[in-house]
């Protein structure tokens, strides 16, 4: 997949996968490294370094809005959603924006988010994680270490209730 292209699996809620630019990734990392405001008390992660961004609206939203517009376009045109279910133009209100610096043996358990849409970006992924993932897939009956999994509904016969994959650096997922 190339920057600007996207793909989403057909199951439950619409999940849009795309790739963010290197400059956006770097800005998020640079600003994330500046903040040291601990945010663990608000998050589900079993991660030691989870920090909330401060004063991000002016630089973040201009970069992020085109992704929301792509989500809206795909919801209406590819997914068959109704325009009435998405307010236009977008009224963007954010609760918080945070960054996780996740290390070996740390993880995010299954959890949910508030709001109409949520997203996750993978800004930096160690090469060793892909190797570890490949090794563990040969031993265990799962997709291995470092994956992200989206759930929707019940696990019933002939029903795809989840999607799981190992993300790449720069991947972003937006979901309802």
Predicted regions and their residues:
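Catalytic core of non-heme Fe(II) oxygenases with the double-stranded beta-helix
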Residues: 96-174
């Amino acid at each position: 997949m190339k920057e600007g292209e996207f793909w989403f699996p057909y199951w439950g809620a619409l999940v849009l996968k795309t790739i963010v630019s290197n400059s956006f990734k770097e800005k998020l990392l640079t600003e994330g490294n500046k903040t040291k405001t601990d945010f663990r008390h608000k998050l589900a992660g079993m991660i030691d370094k989870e920090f909330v961004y401060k004063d991000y609206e002016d630089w973040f939203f201009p970069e992020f809005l085109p992704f929301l517009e792509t989500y809206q376009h795909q919801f209406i045109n590819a997914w068959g959603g109704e325009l009435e279910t998405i307010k236009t133009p977008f009224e963007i209100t954010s609760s918080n924006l945070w960054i996780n610096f996740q290390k070996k043996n740390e993880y995010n358990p299954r959890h949910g988010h508030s709001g109409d849409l949520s997203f996750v970006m993978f800004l930096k992924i160690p090469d060793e994680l892909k190797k570890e993932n490949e090794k563990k897939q040969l031993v265990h009956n799962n997709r291995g270490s470092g994956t992200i999994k989206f759930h929707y509904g019940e696990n019933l016969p002939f029903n795809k209730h989840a999607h799981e994959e190992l993300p790449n650096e720069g991947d972003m997922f937006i979901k309802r």
